[in-house]
């Protein structure tokens, strides 16, 4: 007799995921409320809409995380394994492109960025980034099959990126690098990793599993290249970012704004998720043929993902982000105090990201416990605090983002020659961990608000904050790996120490 789906277990999982997302969002909400009550006066209706948006964000992120875990990860693994069994390389590459495109278009962080960019149509940006990820999913699969070295692939890709950046429209620079950061979000990362692990089974050598790392790093390159190339051909509009202060007037108007937005996002997310669902059902009737219970669990996961995305985007766009921009504008009068304030927000953002815990366990496992999780968390907190400080420095001075990205990536790629390959792969993968939902939804709006209030160029000075946040873990994790590897080598080279109960031969008997 088939065991029915345990709904009590499902409810428990929902509560757990909502609690995780509350842990992620709550520190930012508390800091913002404290600032609104002391240093940055806000209209009560705007603060109330922010709090309602925060609740929707928490519930939406929780449902989405559970849904992605129950649907996107198993879909990626099962399709990857099924493709491997066919031994058909053109089919593997074609499906990888289609799935990379489809999963990216539904990525919530990318949806938020596309709505924020003023001079590029959101549809054009979504399609461009989707094509970029799809093409580099093909590159990822070829790398797994052939065992190509990740370091040299990354060096070649970033050399091409900075060559294009030197000649591209400055208005596209920050957006291009931000696109690479937000693409590796909570929808895309589990799917890419799962599919890569499934396809890596095509090889039986020791490096096969290690080569399944680094997929996120390569898929982050695709959107940057795609948007930079778009800048050479696309005539953007003259629109400017809409940072006008939201005003609701009454509590019923706030409720009306949220209720009016829900049908819009129900339609948008249905269109965005349709390709993923269609591809899955095509595989279900041809190669997978999952049993009823497994299929039902995946379908329930897809429903959770859909509802979570709708709540997430409604909460972000109606309530959460508008106050971020307004807060940045209010605090801009304090000038250079913006730098330490942004650093404090950066510290709390990364400390609260639920995906950081997964990264800590991954590195502890790879280092056989030599690198404690707390060391990784501290290094990431310092790195993201510095990234936010540098972002605000750009707003205050107008320095081009290339002055930070070129040396940053140069040092990160140079470090890859001095640490084991696995650390490089994990470090480049971890950029998506740092540039999570809080950076895309709140911090970008905060920086845009400050830039607008100071009379800066939002496209050139504010965009790029996600890129800096995504870059810093490449440096911090490899630096930690380098220090611990050196320490391990010194320990191995040290003379043997005798234990308390070892027998020590002081002389040898004459032969």
Model feature map: region roles:
Residues 1-2, 140-154, 171, 203-248, ...:
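Juxtamembrane and boundary regions of transmembrane helices in multi-pass small-molecule transporters
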Residues 49-52, 246-355:
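Transmembrane helical segments that form the transport core of multi-pass membrane transport proteins
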Residues 1-21, 25, 76-90, 204-215, ...:
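Intrinsically disordered, low-complexity non-transmembrane regions of multi-pass membrane transporters
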Residues 24-39, 53-63, 95-102, 132-143, ...:
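Hydrophobic core segments of alpha-helical transmembrane domains in multi-pass membrane transport
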Residues 34-48, 68-76, 102-117, 136-147, ...:
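Transmembrane helix-loop junctions in multi-pass membrane proteins
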Residues 15-21, 42-52, 84, 117-126, ...:
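Interfacial loop-to-helix junctions that mark the boundaries of transmembrane helices
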Residues 1-94, 98, 275-307, 311-313, ...:
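N-terminal alpha-helical transmembrane segments of multi-pass membrane transport
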Residues 80-82, 89-160, 339-416:
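Helix-loop-helix junctions within the multi-pass membrane cores of secondary transporters/permeases
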């Amino acid at each position: 007799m088939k065991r029915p789906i345990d709904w009590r277990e499902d409810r428990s999982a929902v509560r757990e995921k909502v609690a995780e997302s509350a842990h992620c969002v709550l520190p930012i909400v508390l800091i913002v409320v404290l600032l609104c009550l002391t240093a940055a006066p806000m209209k009560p209706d705007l603060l109330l809409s922010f709090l309602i948006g925060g609740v929707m964000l928490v519930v939406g992120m929780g449902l989405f995380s559970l849904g992605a875990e129950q649907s996107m990860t198993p879909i990626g693994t099962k399709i990857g394994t099924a493709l491997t069994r066919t031994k058909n390389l053109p089919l593997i590459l074609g499906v990888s492109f289609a799935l990379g495109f489809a999963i990216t278009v539904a990525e919530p962080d990318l949806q938020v960025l596309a709505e924020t960019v003023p001079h590029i149509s959101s549809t054009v940006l979504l399609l461009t980034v989707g094509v970029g990820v799809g093409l580099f999913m093909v590159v990822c699969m070829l790398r797994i099959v052939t065992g190509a070295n990740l370091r040299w692939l990354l060096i070649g890709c970033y050399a091409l990126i900075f060559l294009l950046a030197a000649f591209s429209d400055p208005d596209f620079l920050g957006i291009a690098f931000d696109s690479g950061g937000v693409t590796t979000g909570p929808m895309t990362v589990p799917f890419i990793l799962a599919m890569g692990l499934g396809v890596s089974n095509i090889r039986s050598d020791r490096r096969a599993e290690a080569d399944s790392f680094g997929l996120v790093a390569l898929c982050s390159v695709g959107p940057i290249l795609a948007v930079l190339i778009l800048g050479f051909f696309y005539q953007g509009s003259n629109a400017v970012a809409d940072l006008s202060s939201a005003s609701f007037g009454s509590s019923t108007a706030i409720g009306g704004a949220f209720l009016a937005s829900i049908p819009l996002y129900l339609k948008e997310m249905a269109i965005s998720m349709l390709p993923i669902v269609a591809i899955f059902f095509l595989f279900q009737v041809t190669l997978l043929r999952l049993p009823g219970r497994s299929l039902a669990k995946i379908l329930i996961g897809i429903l959770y993902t859909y509802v979570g995305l709708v709540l997430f985007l409604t909460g972000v766009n109606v309530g959460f982000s508008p106050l971020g921009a307004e807060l940045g504008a209010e605090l801009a009068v304090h000038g250079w105090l913006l730098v330490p304030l942004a650093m404090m927000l950066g510290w709390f953002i990364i400390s609260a990201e639920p995906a950081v815990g997964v990264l800590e366990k991954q590195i502890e496992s790879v280092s056989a416990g030599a690198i404690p999780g707390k060391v990784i968390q501290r290094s990431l907190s310092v790195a993201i605090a510095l990234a936010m400080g540098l972002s605000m420095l750009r707003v205050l001075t107008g320095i081009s983002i290339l002055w930070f990205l070129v040396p940053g990536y140069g040092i990160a790629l140079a470090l890859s020659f001095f640490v084991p390959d696995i650390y490089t792969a994990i470090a480049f993968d971890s950029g998506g961990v740092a540039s999570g939902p809080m950076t895309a939804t709140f911090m970008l709006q905060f920086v845009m608000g400050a830039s607008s209030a100071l009379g800066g160029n939002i496209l050139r000075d504010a965009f790029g904050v996600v890129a800096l946040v995504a870059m810093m873990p490449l440096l911090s994790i490899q630096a930690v790996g380098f220090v611990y590897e050196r320490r391990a080598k010194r320990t191995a080279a040290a003379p043997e120490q005798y234990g308390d109960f070892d027998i020590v031969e002081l002389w040898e008997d004459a032969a």
